[in-house]
Amino acid sequence: MKHTVVSEWQSGMHFVADSVGGNAILDADEEVGGKGLGKRPKPLMLVSLAGCTGMDVVSLLKKMRVEVDDFRVEVNGELTDEHPKTYHTVKVDYYFGGEEVASSKDKIEKAVNLSVDKYCGVYEMFRQFATITFEIHYL
């Protein structure tokens, strides 16, 4: 499978990237020449990680017939101080809430571990350049 993204310069530091499923609007902060009109590229990497693992977990829980009322993935990344600034430490927090959560913790943990260890390609990419950890929280 091959993915192609076309990022077209608009003005200043403003780009519109076309990809599968729609467009992404990117821009830089004002202090580096942008106008704050869109998302920043590095945080979008964290968005991709949260989306990838989140979709895995939802799909796996559905197959396991586990219903959760609330689910969110929070990703925090710490950048290096020197250029090129890359994420060196990443933490993924999974939050689950709902009536079935207490009786389904084993299945929830299995779903998260399968995403982290087997299915989420974005998680695996992050492993190549960052220390990445995760934690599961029950609301």
Annotate the PLM regions.
Residues M1-V47, V58-L139:
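Extended beta-strand/beta-hairpin segments
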